[in-house]
From Swiss-Prot:
TPR repeats lie at residues 11-44, 45-78, 79-112. InterPro entries: CS_dom, HSP20-like_chaperone, SGS_dom, Sgt1-like, TPR-like_helical_dom_sf, TPR_rpt. PROSITE patterns: CS, SGS, TPR, TPR_REGION. This is Protein SGT1 homolog. There is a cross-link at residue 295 (Glycyl lysine isopeptide (Lys-Gly) (interchain with G-Cter in SUMO1)). GO terms for biological process: kinetochore assembly; regulation of protein stability; skeletal muscle satellite cell proliferation; spindle organization. Probably associates with SCF (SKP1-CUL1-F-box protein) complex through interaction with SKP1. Interacts with S100A6. Interacts with HSP90. Residues 169-258 form the CS domain. GO terms for cellular component: cytosol; kinetochore; nuclear body; protein-containing complex; ubiquitin ligase complex. The gene is SUGT1. Residues 276-365 form the SGS domain. There is a cross-link at residue 295 (Glycyl lysine isopeptide (Lys-Gly) (interchain with G-Cter in SUMO2)).
């Protein structure tokens, strides 16, 4: 009975104020009571703001930022909610968003310069981990709750993360090749979602921004050697790479991909390079020529026995007319491979019977 009375008293105390001090004492209990309070008053901006604080103390930053945003929707001038939104973004390592939030909050709070976020918030301001329950009584100074302090921390964190991103970006490679009508750039980035890729084309510039699976941003900006047609240029996101196709206005061969201020002499595609495999490598190979050499070798190769006979049939079929090919196909299929005729006027009128060689017997399996 006494326990029930104590619980009722605690509930009434929370409902009366939901102050930071009371929340500091028992964040989980405060969270439950605030949730009940919001069921009765779903449009109370302060309740959302204080519930965000409960979630912050419990380390639930993703949920906390949602409550802080809801509080700001209901009361855009609530700088405490702005501060708590920024704290969540900071601890989720979304430093750019946190910096923007703190800067906006500083404008709202220009008169006072700081806000109290609760006695248990000290460790949250200085650590990426939620505080232990036995340390929630630590005090917080005005400096720790100052928007300016948070802005500085975000800037320092951004500078550190940018250097890490630069190191990571330096490991990302891209390659390019060209055809007569387009230049194709391949970014060697795996497992990227299409919504996380933004590519912008201009006449002589390409800009690509990719949100990597790690959460970092990859930037590629190229000043192109020759003009392109932006509206006909496209990109495709695949599981193993990102493929960017730049449309050429004319069949000009690019000597290199980038050109900074230089005016290159256009070189037209000519017949002797038409069937070269497109590549940025200085070494090229004419595949038509290679195929021709292989065919010539096969033609001059001396075969014996069945191999020579098969070569003869292949040559007859390759050089034959449509009627010859039809006759060979029909006779071979209907006779079970025992007859091969080139006379369509004969085999076209009848079914070709099975006729094995004299020393062999036909068996059906």
């Amino acid at each position: 009975m006494a326990a029930a009375a104590a619980g009722t008293a605690t509930s009434q105390r929370f409902f009366q104020s939901f102050s930071d001090a009371l929340i500091d004492e028992d964040p989980q209990a405060a969270l439950e009571e605030l949730t009940k309070a919001l069921e009765q008053k779903p449009d109370d901006a302060q309740y959302y703001c204080q519930r965000a604080y409960c979630h912050i103390l419990l380390g639930n930053y993703c949920v906390a930022v949602a409550d802080a945003k809801k509080s700001l929707e209901l009361n855009p001038n609530n700088s405490t909610a702005m501060l708590r939104k920024g704290i969540c973004e900071y601890h989720e390592k979304n430093y750019a968003a946190a910096l923007e939030t703190f800067t906006e909050g500083q404008k709202l709070d220009i008169e006072t310069g700081f806000h109290r976020v609760g006695q248990a918030g000290l460790q949250l301001l200085t650590s990426s981990d939620p505080p232990a329950l036995d340390s929630q009584s630590a005090g917080i100074t005005g400096a720790d709750a100052n928007f300016s302090v948070w802005i500085k921390r975000c800037q320092e964190a951004q500078n550190g993360s940018e250097s890490e991103v630069w190191t990571h970006q330096s490991k990302i490679k891209y390659d390019w090749y060209q055809t007569e009508s387009q230049v194709v750039i391949t970014l060697m980035i795996k497992n990227v979602q299409k919504n996380d890729v933004n590519v912008e084309f201009s006449e002589k510039e390409l800009s690509a921004l990719v949100k990597l699976p790690s959460g970092e941003d990859y930037n590629l900006k190229l000043e192109l050697l020759h003009p392109i047609i932006p509206e006909q240029s496209t990109f495709k996101v695949l599981s193993t790479k990102i493929e960017i196709k730049l449309k050429k206005p004319e069949a000009v061969r690019w000597e290199k991909l980038e050109g900074q201020g230089d005016v290159p002499t256009p070189k037209q595609f000519v017949a002797d390079v038409k069937n070269l495999y497109p590549s940025s490598s200085p070494y090229t190979r004419n595949w038509d020529k290679l195929v021709g050499e292989i065919k010539e070798e096969e033609k001059n190769e001396k075969l014996e026995g069945d191999a020579a006979l098969n070569r003869l049939f292949q040559q007859i079929y390759s050089d034959g007319s449509d009627e010859v090919k039809r006759a060979m196909n029909k006779s071979f299929m209907e006779s079970g491979g025992t007859v091969l005729s080139t006379n369509w006027s004969d085999v076209g009128k009848r079914k070709v019977e099975i006729n094995p060689p004299d020393d062999m017997e036909w068996k059906k399996y």
